[in-house]
Swiss-Prot record:
One of its GO terms (biological process) is G protein-coupled receptor signaling pathway. It holds the Pfam family 7tm_1. It is found in: Cell membrane. Residues 1-38, 97-109, 171-198, 290-305 are extracellular. Belongs to the G-protein coupled receptor 1 family. It comes from the Eukaryota. The chain crosses the membrane at residues 39-59, 76-96, 110-130, 150-170, 199-219, 269-289, 306-326. This is Probable G-protein coupled receptor 45. GO terms for molecular function: G protein-coupled receptor activity.
Length: 372
């Protein structure tokens, strides 16, 4: 372990601060708190798996929902599903037992899978953000389902290329019990540190910077468009009600409706971005400190800090389906349809009756309307 190696100074520091490094994890958090966190993490696993599975099922079963944006969202959901299944249960078990029961090789594999699926999820969120920027700011809607599939395939390959070196032993992966999960450990090797910096920049700092700039430009464009549409509507008078004036009025109304739809879609993506930032900023700082600061890595608070930041990073997998259910009406309807009949509180209203109750409802799913 990194805290037991390297130099006399590190050994002296370890004797003074962590007299039993291999068992330090068992003394950092009380047993009731560890068990509670593990139970909550298992619940997060179930909720994240079920919620993201619904997203994938909706896109798979309904051809009208296979637009470019929905394919991207389904890929994001799939990466969260794999993260929930491949990493979270083992972290929960380690939290309870304060021991890693799955071997050193699987420890390194689990750390690689963790970063791999996180990288893919971040890449998809970045692609969606750039697509929203091109549509709203540049007025270029170039992303079709075929191109989306190619971009998704490329993102999987790039994510594996970035996360893969940790599987081959490029950097130190620390086995619990110093942390509730196999994490990047302290190292003084320049190559290992360079890899960790590349990994953290690719996971958080670079996507965060690009998405932040994109959203600032989008907000500015939406604000200007809203002011222009409002001013044009206020300037109408009866003298403009000619044939040309009516056509211009119809175009303005279409712009207003399109602006409203794009603003709502952008708001949903913006909420996902905020959730990503809040969940991953602490983990990114923690990863850098673990590799560069021996005082932090060998300190008595490392286990508690690891538990908190890992728990927060997993929360993002649960956060996305909650946002979909809150913001997307079709997602809520699909959840109700997928529930077994015995668990449905309200009876399902047939489509013909829904048309009579709400005649204005348009049952058309084109590429734009089926997106979030």
């Amino acid at each position: 372990m990194a805290c037991n190696s390297t130099s006399l100074e590190a050994y002296t520091y370890l004797l003074l601060n962590t007299s039993n490094a291999s068992d330090s994890g068992s003394t950092q958090l009380p047993a009731p708190l560890r068990i509670s966190l593990a139970i909550v993490m298992l619940l997060m696993t179930v909720v994240g798996f079920l919620g993201n599975t619904v997203v994938c099922i909706i896109v798979y079963q309904r051809p009208a929902m296979r637009s470019a944006i929905n394919l991207l969202l389904a890929t994001l959901a799939f990466s969260d599903i794999m993260l929930s299944l491949c990493c979270m249960p083992f972290t929960a078990v380690t939290l309870i037992t304060v021991r890693w029961h799955f071997g050193d090789h699987f420890c390194r594999l689990s750390a690689t899978l963790y970063w791999f699926f996180v990288l893919e999820g971040v890449a998809i969120l970045l692609i969606i953000s750039v697509d929203r920027f091109l549509i709203i700011v540049q007025r270029q809607d170039k992303l079709n389902p075929r191109r989306a599939k190619v971009i998704i395939a490329v993102s999987w390959v790039l994510s594996f290329c970035i996360a893969g070196p940790s599987l081959t032993g490029w950097t130190l992966v620390e086995v619990p019990a110093r942390a509730p999960q196999c994490v990047l450990g302290y190292t003084e090797l320049p190559a290992d540190r360079a890899y960790v910096v590349t990994l953290v920049v690719a996971v958080f700092f670079a996507p965060f910077g690009v998405m932040l700039c994109a959203y600032m430009c989008i907000l500015n464009t939406v604000r200007k468009n809203a002011v222009r549409v409002h001013n044009q509507s206020d300037s109408l008078d009866l003298r403009q009600l000619t044939r040309a004036g009516l056509r211009r009025l119809q175009r303005q109304q279409q712009v207003s409706v399109d602006l409203s739809f794009k603003t709502k879609a952008f708001t949903t993506i913006l909420i996902l971005f905020v959730g990503f930032s809040l969940c991953w900023l602490p983990h990114s700082v923690y990863s850098l400190l673990s590799v560069f600061s021996q005082r932090f890595y060998c300190g008595s608070s490392f286990y508690a800090t690891s538990t908190c930041v890992l728990w927060l990073s997993y929360l993002k997998s649960v956060f996305n389906p909650i946002v979909y259910c809150w913001r997307i009406k079709k997602f809520r309807e699909a959840c109700i349809e997928l529930l077994p009949q015995t668990f449905q509180i309200l009876p399902k209203v047939p489509e013909r009756i829904r048309r009579r109750i709400q005649p204005s409802t348009v049952y058309v799913c084109n590429e734009n309307q089926s997106a979030v």
